[in-house]
Regions:
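Short hydrophobic beta-strand segments
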Residues: 2-6, 157-160
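Active-site helix-to-loop segments that bind/position phosphate- or nucleotide-bearing substrates
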Residues: 4-91
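Internal, well-folded beta-alpha domain core
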Residues: 88-239, 243-249
């Protein structure tokens, strides 16, 4: 069983704690992406990054000195978005790190795919960015089916905790033999169930933590998730979609 998760824009360097285990599997293709980005002007990159002048300047300077092989941080500690804050890997025990290394895969526009203990550096790039490298018109074409092939294992079970921007990298290549389960977090707004971005990100991280702490191998066990006020709605769920509703007090 594999769990897929989106990356986060906010990243840090932490070389004082856990050391990375290895480099991301597609580091050579990452080097191609980096070279392509270095060939662009600051204004071109600002348009790609969709950011203000200050953030563009910061990332442009970082890009010029970027080293894919030194001063690396384990991916699960490098990303600092909401999902990773609620996953709280910094307080994991060894068993949880081992579980995540075997089961969690973080999808990335820059690296393609990373294991939790792969060494990464801070970068800014989203999968839907207008980036054409070689014959590829965009990053979805650039990474092709490589992400899917890295995620699928003998169990053929994938738990989708990623956003649509990233999960579509996998969904395009699914086969009838695969069991792909999307996790939906929602709450009642008026008379409708809606997904609220911040709460969904919190829940995704909390669920990764729950799965790791309970060493889950059977997807049915995920239905027991009951943190942050969420509970499983069997009446709204299916084999391909597990729906969790947050009760608002």
């Amino acid at each position: 069983m594999k769990i897929i998760l989106s990356p986060a824009k906010k990243m840090i360097v932490d070389t004082d704690n856990l050391a990375p285990v290895e480099l991301p599997v597609y580091i050579d293709k990452t080097a191609e992406v980096l070279n392509w980005m270095k060939s662009k002007s600051k204004e071109e990159l600002k348009a790609i990054w969709k950011c203000n002048d200050k953030i563009a300047e910061q990332n442009f300077n970082r890009l010029e000195n970027m080293d894919l092989y030194n001063r690396l941080t384990p991916a699960v500690l490098a990303y600092e978005g909401i999902a990773f804050q609620y996953m709280a890997p910094s307080v994991f025990e060894i068993q949880q790190f081992e579980y995540l290394q075997n089961h969690l895969r973080i999808l990335s526009a820059f690296y393609g795919i990373v294991k939790p203990m792969d060494g990464v550096i801070p970068y800014r790039l989203e999968m839907q960015a207008k980036v054409g490298i070689g014959d590829a018109k965009n990053l979805y074409e650039y990474w092709r089916d490589l992400l899917y092939r890295s995620v699928i294992d003998d169990s053929r079970i994938i738990i989708n905790l990623a956003s649509k921007e990233y999960s579509k990298c996998i969904e395009k290549y699914l086969t009838p033999q695969d069991r792909y389960i999307t996790i939906v977090f929602c709450e009642l707004s008026g008379d409708k169930l809606v997904t609220k971005g911040t709460y969904a990100k919190m829940a995704r991280g909390e669920m990764v933590r729950f799965i790791a702490e309970n060493n889950i191998e059977n997807p049915v066990e995920i239905q027991k998730f009951d943190r942050l006020g969420y509970s499983f709605r069997s009446d709204l769920s299916s084999d391909a979609e597990y729906v969790f509703e947050r009760k608002i007090k």
